[in-house]
């Protein structure tokens, strides 16, 4: 949620941000008007309550013969106070409802526009060259006995798979490599809940216009998370933190996404699935340190890409493709040989105080007051990375060379061999 002070004092900042996102600029003006009405309602309530308190003292001190009439007046006044309180509460709810529709103000320099309007910041590693026709990750996975889409569909439906044998071992190895990288950089590991309450899902910004992407268990009123970011953001809800140094967490979880808007996209293999595993970095820090921490998260992601021998690029995501919570997001995309293009493997977002303000996660300032912390997140490994690893390191016979950094996590295995070879 945005800062009401920013709304009142710098509405043009929000107007420019909304315009860059392709969202309604009118929401800012609506919020300003509702804020005026809210403050007027609160003032009216507080004045009536002060009058009620003063009248109560008068009743207490009045002679006995006057009290009956004064008590009747006090009861009438109490009714007016209650009514004013209800009006103020309704105005507060309207204001919060409008505020929640306004996206996080984007950081200066974020490109305007939609999904295709990103800026390429760098490209690392050359395009892999093969002296043969490369196989895609599913063909390789089937040769290796590593990916079974048919039985995944039989058991659970489209966009589900079994990772078996070398596939299961490869994912576990990848996740453990990422976990060790996180530990080396001071992250505390957590295995997080994958079911969360509505207020936590709402607080992180995942129940807005894309709520149809989320699985909801209606009977229990719980949501399946598409990232451990949600649980990690809720971990310190309603708390006052010491963020003299950043609090860094690495959440390991199974993730679930409905992919409601992805009909016909990436229907082959495990690029876009309903269930996957992910190791997510999540940081609480001081707002003034958020941009520097964002750069660190990106650097750690790049270290992982380089450790796995993947060619990649980094893009600065355009404002209209950020989602409501992020003020800036970098995507790291790996080259997928059989598609002849880069595909997103990971992203990292600076959410500023947007999530913390909703979830009441605060720190104490030097003056002793409390203020919302900044939150950031970034993926360090996920199931989709297997796609790039298999395709990049494949050999003509269908075997796959294991990146050196993964070998200790696979018992020293250097080559993934096709079944029966």
Swiss-Prot record:
Subcellular location: Cytoplasm
EC number assigned by the record: 6.1.1.11
GO cellular component terms attached to this protein's record: cytoplasm
InterPro entries in UniProt: aa-tRNA-synt_IIb, aa-tRNA-synth_II, aa-tRNA-synth_II/BPL/LPL, Ser-tRNA-ligase_type_1, Ser-tRNA-synth_1_N, SerRS_1_N_sf, SerRS_core, tRNA-bd_arm
Binding residue positions for L-serine: 227-229, 280, 379
GO terms of molecular function: ATP binding; serine-tRNA ligase activity
GO biological process terms held by the UniProt record: selenocysteine biosynthetic process; seryl-tRNA aminoacylation
EC primary class: ligase
Catalytic activities: tRNA(Ser) + L-serine + ATP = L-seryl-tRNA(Ser) + AMP + diphosphate + H(+); tRNA(Sec) + L-serine + ATP = L-seryl-tRNA(Sec) + AMP + diphosphate + H(+)
Summary of the function given for this chain in its UniProt record: Catalyzes the attachment of serine to tRNA(Ser). Is also able to aminoacylate tRNA(Sec) with serine, to form the misacylated tRNA L-seryl-tRNA(Sec), which will be further converted into selenocysteinyl-tRNA(Sec).
Quaternary structure (record): Homodimer. The tRNA molecule binds across the dimer.
Family: Belongs to the class-II aminoacyl-tRNA synthetase family. Type-1 seryl-tRNA synthetase subfamily.
Domain comment (free text): Consists of two distinct domains, a catalytic core and a N-terminal extension that is involved in tRNA binding.
Protein name per Swiss-Prot or TrEMBL: Serine--tRNA ligase
């Amino acid at each position: 949620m945005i800062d009401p002070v920013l709304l009142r004092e710098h509405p043009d900042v929000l107007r420019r941000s909304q315009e860059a996102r392709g969202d309604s600029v009118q929401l800012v003006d609506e919020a300003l008007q509702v804020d005026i009405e809210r403050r007027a309602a609160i003032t009216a309530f507080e004045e009536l309550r002060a009058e009620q308190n003063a009248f109560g003292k008068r009743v207490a001190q009045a002679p006995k013969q006057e009290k009956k009439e004064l008590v009747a007046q006090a009861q009438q006044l109490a009714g007016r106070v209650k009514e004013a309180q209800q009006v103020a509460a309704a105005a507060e709810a309207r204001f919060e409802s409008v505020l929640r529709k306004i996206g996080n103000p984007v950081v200066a320099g974020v490109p305007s526009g939609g999904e295709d309007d990103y800026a390429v910041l760098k490209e690392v590693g050359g395009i892999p060259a093969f002296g043969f026709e490369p196989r895609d990750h599913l063909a390789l996975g089937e040769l290796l006995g590593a990916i079974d889409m048919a039985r995944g569909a039989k058991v659970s439906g489209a966009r589900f798979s079994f990772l078996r044998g070398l596939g299961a071992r490869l994912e576990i190895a990848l996740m453990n490599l990422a976990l060790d990288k996180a530990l080396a950089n001071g992250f505390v590991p957590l295995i997080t809940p994958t079911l969360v309450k509505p207020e936590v899902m709402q607080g992180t910004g995942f129940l807005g216009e894309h709520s149809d992407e989320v699985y909801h268990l209606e009977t229990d009123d719980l949501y399946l998370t598409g990232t451990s970011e949600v649980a990690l953001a809720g971990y310190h809800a309603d708390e006052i933190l010491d963020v003299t140094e950043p609090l860094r967490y690495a959440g390991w979880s199974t993730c679930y996404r409905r992919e409601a808007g992805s009909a016909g996209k990436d229907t082959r293999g495990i690029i876009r699935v309903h269930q996957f595993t992910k190791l997510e970095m999540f940081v609480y820090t001081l707002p003034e340190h958020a941009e520097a921490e964002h750069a660190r998260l990106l650097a750690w992601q790049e270290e992982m890409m380089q450790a796995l021998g993947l060619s990649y690029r980094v893009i600065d995501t355009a404002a209209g493709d950020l989602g409501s919570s992020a003020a800036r997001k970098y995507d790291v995309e790996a080259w997928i040989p059989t598609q002849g293009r880069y595909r997103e493997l990971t992203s990292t977002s600076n959410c500023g105080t947007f999530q913390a303000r909703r979830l009441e996660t605060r720190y104490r300032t030097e003056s002793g007051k409390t203020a919302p912390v900044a939150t950031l997140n970034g993926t360090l490994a996920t199931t989709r990375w297997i796609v790039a690893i298999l395709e990049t390191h494949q050999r003509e016979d269908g075997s796959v060379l294991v990146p050196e950094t993964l070998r200790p996590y696979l018992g020293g295995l250097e080559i993934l061999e096709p079944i029966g070879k």
